[in-house]
Swiss-Prot record:
Gene Ontology biological process terms, A to Z: tRNA N1-guanine methylation
Catalysed reaction, written as an equation: guanosine(37) in tRNA + S-adenosyl-L-methionine = N(1)-methylguanosine(37) in tRNA + S-adenosyl-L-homocysteine + H(+)
Family statement: Belongs to the RNA methyltransferase TrmD family.
CDD domains: TrmD-like (cd18080)
A GO CC term assigned to this protein in UniProt: cytosol
Subunit structure: Homodimer.
Name of a matching Pfam family: tRNA_m1G_MT
Species in which this protein is naturally found: Methylibium petroleiphilum (strain ATCC BAA-1232 / LMG 22953 / PM1)
EC code(s) of this entry: 2.1.1.228
Source species, domain of life: Bacteria
Gene: trmD
The name this protein goes by in its record: tRNA (guanine-N(1)-)-methyltransferase
PANTHER family: TRNA (GUANINE-N(1)-)-METHYLTRANSFERASE
Function: Specifically methylates guanosine-37 in various tRNAs.
Length: 256
C-alpha cells in the first residue's frame, strides 16, 4: 500500500523508516511512503506557504494553492505509477478519533494521502475541496500533523503480512477485539519473596483453556475498571458472550 504525505517537515519521517518492527514494512515494499514538501510548490522566491488569517488573530494559515499543487503532483505520480487514487486524510482536532477498527480498515485499503497541517491550521477552502476524512489522536493539541501521520502509518504498517514475526500478535493487541489487552509476564518467575512478585499460577499451569479464560477475564476486568466506555461499546456490538457478562456481573463495585 502507498502513503503520500504532504508535510513541511519530511525529515521527521526518515528515522521512522529505518528502525523498529515497522522497518520491515518499508524494506519489503509492503508500505511505500512518499513525502511531498509543499514549499516545493510555492510560487514565490521565499517558498512561502502561509499567510496571515483574514479577520485577524494570532498565528498563520497554510495557503490553499501550494497544497493544491502538491496534491495535483501526487495525483499525477499515482496515475503514472498505475496506483490507486487514494483518499485524502487530514489530522485535525475536529476529526473523528482514530480507532483500531479504523486502522484495520485502512490496512486493507490501497493507502491514503496524509495532509499534515501546521501553524493555526489550513485554509478551510482546501479542506472543503479536497479532504475526504478528518482524524484526531485525541483531545489535545500538537504542533502539527506529522506525529499523527507517523502514528497512523505505524499502526497500519504493523498489520501488513510479514511485518510482525508472529502474525497472531496483533490479534491479541489492545482494541483488536474492542477491549484492552490483558497483562503479560515473562522470566524470572519470581522477583522476590512476596506472592505478588510472582507470575500468576494459571499462566504457569500449561492448561491452555484455563490460560485463555484467565486472559479473557483480565481483559474484561481491566477494561471495565479503566475504560467502561469500551465495555458498553462491545456490548452494543454483540462482542460479549454470556460468560463475559456473568464475569462482569461478578466484579465488585462496578455496576455493569
Amino acid at each position: 500500500m502507498r502513503f503520500d504525505v504532504l508535510t513541511l517537515f519530511p525529515e521527521l519521517f526518515a528515522p521512522f523508516q529505518a528502525v523498529g518492527v515497522t522497518r520491515r514494512a518499508f524494506e519489503s515494499g509492503a508500505i511505500d511512503l512518499k513525502l511531498w514538501q509543499p514549499r516545493d510548490f510555492a510560487d514565490n522566491a521565499y517558498r512561502r506557504v502561509d499567510d496571515r488569517p483574514y479577520g485577524g488573530g494570532p498565528g498563520m494559515v497554510m495557503l490553499v494553492e501550494p497544497l493544491e499543487r502538491a496534491l495535483a503532483a501526487v495525483r499525477d505520480d499515482q496515475a503514472a505509477a498505475g496506483a490507486a487514487r487514494t483518499p485524502v486524510l487530514l489530522f485535525s482536532p475536529a476529526g473523528a478519533p482514530l480507532t483500531q477498527r479504523r486502522v484495520e480498515a485502512l490496512a486493507s485499503e490501497a493507502g491514503a494521502v496524509l495532509v499534515c497541517g501546521r501553524y493555526e491550521g489550513i485554509d478551510q477552502r482546501f479542506i472543503d475541496r479536497h479532504v475526504d476524512e478528518e482524524l484526531s489522536l485525541g483531545d489535545f493539541v500538537l504542533s502539527g500533523g506529522e506525529l499523527p501521520a507517523l502514528a497512523l502509518v505505524d499502526a497500519v504498517a504493523r498489520l501488513q503480512p510479514g511485518v510482525l514475526n508472529d502474525q497472531t500478535s496483533h490479534q491479541q493487541d489492545s482494541f483488536s477485539d474492542g477491549l484492552l489487552d490483558c497483562p503479560h509476564y515473562s522470566r524470572p518467575e519470581h522477583l522476590g519473596d512476596a506472592a505478588a512478585d510472582g507470575v500468576p499460577a494459571t499462566l504457569m499451569s500449561g492448561h491452555h483453556a484455563e490460560i485463555a479464560r484467565w486472559r479473557r477475564e483480565r481483559q474484561l476486568e481491566l477494561t471495565a475498571r479503566r475504560r467502561p466506555d469500551l465495555i458498553a461499546a462491545a456490548r452494543a456490538q454483540g462482542r460479549l458472550t454470556k460468560a463475559d457478562e456473568r464475569y462482569l456481573q461478578s466484579l465488585p463495585g462496578l455496576g455493569l
